[in-house]
């Protein structure tokens, strides 16, 4: 099974100079990021709903990556097709940037974790500097809940059929980490950077 659009070529990322991060780590100038991911309560006296299992990825800040992410978000407003392509494109761009960091030998600067049952997360031992936090939370939704007109379906993955959808909430934050400090971040559904609907597809049966 594949996410529609995920197979398309991601927008190339521009490698980030990691020398400052390595120097900070070598000198012991490290800090961290903690936070909580949750849905805000819509009723008085009703507790917030933690989004356990949300994925949190922290990467060295790249102005190039931020610009490209914002461009995908802006383009998503152009049409229904662009909106459906946005979620897979955002994920593909993040993964391409992770791979560039790994390939450059900076695998230790790619940090990831998941939110616990209460929605809390912690990313420790980050060298002091500017970082980019990208968090995602996916919920499987009914196959027909987000379906468009038949002519709009399957435009990204020929010879496949739709098996379902994921509603993906995405948070994008720029964080400055300082020595000996832990930056606290609350990520709520209302404060999400982008909400995507990602198609799940499987290959058509061969005849």
Predicted regions located by residue number:
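Long luminal/extracellular ectodomains of secretory-pathway precursor proteins
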Residues: 9-207
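Bacterial N-terminal signal peptides
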Residues: 1-5
């Amino acid at each position: 099974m594949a996410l529609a659009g995920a197979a398309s070529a991601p927008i190339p990322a521009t490698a980030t100079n990691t020398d400052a991060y390595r120097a900070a780590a070598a000198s012991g100038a490290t800090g961290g990021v903690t936070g909580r991911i949750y849905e805000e309560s819509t009723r008085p006296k009703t507790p917030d709903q933690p989004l356990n299992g949300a994925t949190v990825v922290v990467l060295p800040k790249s102005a190039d990556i931020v610009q490209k992410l914002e461009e995908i978000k802006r383009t998503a407003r152009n049409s229904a097709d662009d909106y459906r392509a946005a979620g897979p494109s955002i994920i593909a761009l993040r993964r391409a940037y992770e791979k560039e960091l790994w390939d450059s030998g900076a695998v230790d600067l790619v940090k990831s974790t998941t939110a616990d049952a209460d929605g809390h997360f912690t990313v420790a031992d980050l060298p002091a500097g500017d970082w980019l936090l990208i968090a995602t939370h996916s919920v499987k939704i009914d196959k027909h809940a987000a379906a468009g007109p038949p002519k709009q379906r399957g435009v990204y993955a020929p010879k496949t059929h739709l098996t379902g959808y994921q509603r993906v909430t995405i948070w994008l934050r720029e964080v400055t980490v300082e020595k000996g400090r832990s930056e606290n971040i609350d990520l709520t559904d209302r404060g999400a950077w982008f909400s995507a609907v990602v198609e799940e597809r499987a290959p058509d049966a061969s005849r």
